């Protein structure tokens, strides 16, 4: 596999980095954390102005027609700024629709989701019981569950779409350590659902997309942490010298850089594997 970015990928990287650096400021992130955990304006601008919310979706269903590598590039840029946006659930649900949804389901949700008009969350839990297409059960720790308009429910045997406002759906928001990714408990009591016709493909695609987003966001955060630490080491003076000049400090920074580069290789290798459909994916 060739890990060198193409010109198009570099352009996406530069665009995403500039967008999140300018808009996902610490002040806006703190404001989101003090509220419901989401920067709604940032998400709307990302979807509508940047137009990359459907980057890894096929063009024939309303996407950009690129792949997981491009998605990872964007998620890395978002993670670098600790962006308070519902990208994880969005990617999991849209990937599930692309891989295992019906034409009607895609028509109902893809445009609304990629346009920022609706928010999605994924609840994958084996304890959810299905009687036909009626669902019951409780799923805990659903990212952005309390903000979602549509939920992807999957229990390993089937996958269903449930509208958050449907009868029998009770969602309780929780305060967690990472306030930029608020969690919720979703309780289903005899809830009518819309089954995806190809659940195995949908679940596999949702999990793959979710893991790419999570790992790329973490990579972006790690790289930004290192960059800021290096910058601080050049400015902070102790014993008459910049602390970055001390050998022990240099060694720690070098170790961190090596670990981040190893993580970067793993993230983009995984993204390439998904795009190419290899067995390792």
Label each region the model flagged.
Residues 1-81, 103-104, 116, 205-281:
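Alpha-helical interface subdomain recognition
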Residues 54-57, 88-91, 121:
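Short beta-strands and strand-loop turn motifs
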Residues 9, 17, 90, 94-95, ...:
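Structured catalytic cores of enzymes that bind and process phosphorylated ligands/cofactors
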Residues 74, 87-88:
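Extended, compositionally biased flexible segments
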Residues 39-41, 99, 129-133:
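Short, solvent-exposed polar/charged micro-motifs at secondary-structure junctions
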Residues 47, 72-75, 94-97, 110, ...:
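Conserved protein kinase catalytic domain
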Residues 66, 83-86, 95, 104-227, ...:
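FAD-binding core of flavoproteins
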């Amino acid at each position: 596999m060739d890990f060198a970015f193409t010109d198009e990928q570099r352009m996406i990287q530069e665009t995403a980095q500039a967008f999140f650096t300018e808009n996902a400021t610490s002040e806006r992130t703190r404001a989101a954390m003090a509220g419901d955990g989401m920067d709604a304006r940032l998400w709307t601008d990302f979807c509508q102005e940047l137009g990359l919310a459907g980057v890894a979706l096929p063009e024939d269903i309303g996407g950009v027609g690129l792949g997981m590598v491009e998605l990872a590039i964007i998620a890395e840029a978002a993670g670098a700024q600790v962006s308070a946006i519902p990208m994880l659930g969005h990617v999991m649900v849209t990937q599930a629709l692309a891989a295992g949804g019906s034409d009607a389901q895609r028509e109902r949700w893809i445009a609304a989701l990629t346009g920022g008009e609706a928010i999605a969350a994924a609840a994958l839990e084996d304890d959810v019981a299905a009687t036909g297409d009626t669902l019951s059960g409780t799923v805990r720790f659903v990212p952005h569950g309390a903000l979602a308009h549509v939920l992807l429910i999957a229990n390993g045997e089937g996958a269903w779409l449930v509208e958050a406002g449907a009868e029998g759906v009770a969602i309780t928001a929780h305060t967690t350590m990472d306030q930029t990714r608020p969690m919720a408990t979703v309780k289903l009591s005899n809830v009518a659902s819309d089954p995806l016709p190809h659940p195995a493909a949908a679940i596999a695609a949702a999990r793959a997309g979710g893991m790419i987003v999570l790992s790329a966001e973490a990579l972006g955060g790690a790289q930004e942490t290192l960059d800021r630490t290096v910058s601080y080491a050049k400015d902070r003076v102790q014993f008459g010298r910049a602390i970055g000049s001390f050998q022990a400090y240099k060694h720690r920074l070098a170790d961190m850089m090596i670990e981040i580069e190893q993580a970067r290789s793993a993230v983009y290798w995984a993204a390439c594997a998904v795009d190419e459909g290899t067995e390792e994916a």
